[in-house]
Amino acid sequence: MAKKSKIAKEQKRQELVNKYYELRKELKAKGDYEALRKLPRDSSPTRLTRRCKVTGRPRGVLRKFEMSRIAFREHAHKGQIPGVKKSSW
């Protein structure tokens, strides 16, 4: 489980990205890079990290399920993810 402070920090970044999305889009279209530079750093979407919705783990996250590989494996074995089954050939 990730530290709660890290998860909270990531949520705060997501809120800032959502807040400044339209303004950032307009400034980019105008080419006003000076004004873009004055916006908060955390309002840039490139600073976001995908995190596991179950554990908060930042690495090894499967995009489709928004879960880390470890949590995905556990839930898949229990049959808690619809449409996922262990393959064999």
Curated annotation (Swiss-Prot):
One of the GO biological process terms = translation
Cite the SUPFAM superfamilies for this sequence.
Glucocorticoid receptor-like (DNA-binding domain)
- Signal peptide extent: none
Listed GO CC annotations: cytoplasm; small ribosomal subunit
Instruction: List the Pfam families hit by this protein, alphabetically.
Output: Ribosomal_S14
Show the Gene3D superfamilies listed in the entry: 30s Ribosomal Protein S14, Chain N
Q: Name one GO molecular function term.
A: rRNA binding
Give the top-rank taxon of the lineage listed in the UniProt record for this protein: Bacteria
> Per its UniProt record, what InterPro entries does this chain match?
Ribosomal_uS14, Ribosomal_uS14_bac/plastid, Ribosomal_uS14_CS, Ribosomal_uS14_sf
Sorted alphabetically, which keywords does the UniProt record give? Ribonucleoprotein, Ribosomal protein, RNA-binding, rRNA-binding
Q: What does this protein do?
A: Binds 16S rRNA, required for the assembly of 30S particles and may also be responsible for determining the conformation of the 16S rRNA at the A site.
Subunit-level organization: Part of the 30S ribosomal subunit. Contacts proteins S3 and S10.
Family listed: Belongs to the universal ribosomal protein uS14 family.
Check the record and name the PANTHER family matching this protein: 30S RIBOSOMAL PROTEIN S14, SMALL RIBOSOMAL SUBUNIT PROTEIN US14M
Q: What is this protein called?
A: Small ribosomal subunit protein uS14A
The species this protein belongs to is Staphylococcus epidermidis (strain ATCC 35984 / DSM 28319 / BCRC 17069 / CCUG 31568 / BM 3577 / RP62A)
Highest classification ranks of the organism: Bacteria, Bacillati, Bacillota, Bacilli, Bacillales
